[in-house]
């Protein structure tokens, strides 16, 4: 907004001097045209008129130079200052953009490091959990093996006891069968007497 107002003021400084210079040149042109007919009619150069026109031209040029010198110098000076200001702003924005880029790059690098750290921690935690599961499975397998060994030992012991009992029963039955076959009546009487005697002695 301020730049637009300043630009209008700068243009106004040029318009009025140019308008005045245009009026002077127009007046000089009219004077030149009015004097031109006499020159063509007479066929010789009118030095007084030539000098007057030259003087008017010099005065006009001097006035224009004086009027336009400062506005033109001011215009170019202001334009130079404006360009320098724009360049400074552009350089500042470029530095800000580079700084933002560097900050974003640093944040991205930090994010990558943090992400890798989290991934490594998760992998380590997973490895720990996996090791715990393996250890628990091994303990459970050992416990089951021990239980199986105990059960097998108990079954073996029971089988042995049963076998011993069966052998004892078979031995007794075989002995009874042998005794029945080989024992005579007098032997039976003797065994009965011995048994009764032991019973009496025990009492």
Curated annotation (Swiss-Prot):
GO terms for cellular component: plasma membrane; proton-transporting ATP synthase complex. The chain crosses the membrane at residues 14-34. Pfam families: ATP-synt_B (PF00430). It is a single-pass membrane protein. InterPro entries: ATP_synth_b/b'su_bac/chlpt (IPR002146), ATP_synthase_B_chain (IPR050059). It is found in: Cell inner membrane. Its main location: membrane. Keywords: ATP synthesis, Cell inner membrane, Cell membrane, CF(0), Hydrogen ion transport, Ion transport, Membrane, Transmembrane, Transmembrane helix, Transport. One of its GO terms (molecular function) is proton-transporting ATPase activity, rotational mechanism. Belongs to the ATPase B chain family. F-type ATPases have 2 components, F(1) - the catalytic core - and F(0) - the membrane proton channel. F(1) has five subunits: alpha(3), beta(3), gamma(1), delta(1), epsilon(1). F(0) has three main subunits: a(1), b(2) and c(10-14). The alpha and beta chains form an alternating ring which encloses part of the gamma chain. F(1) is attached to F(0) by a central stalk formed by the gamma and epsilon chains, while a peripheral stalk is formed by the delta and b chains. F(1)F(0) ATP synthase produces ATP from ADP in the presence of a proton or sodium gradient. F-type ATPases consist of two structural domains, F(1) containing the extramembraneous catalytic core and F(0) containing the membrane proton channel, linked together by a central stalk and a peripheral stalk. During catalysis, ATP synthesis in the catalytic domain of F(1) is coupled via a rotary mechanism of the central stalk subunits to proton translocation. This is ATP synthase subunit b. It comes from Syntrophobacter fumaroxidans (strain DSM 10017 / MPOB). The lineage of its organism: Bacteria, Pseudomonadati, Thermodesulfobacteriota, Syntrophobacteria, Syntrophobacterales. The gene is atpF.
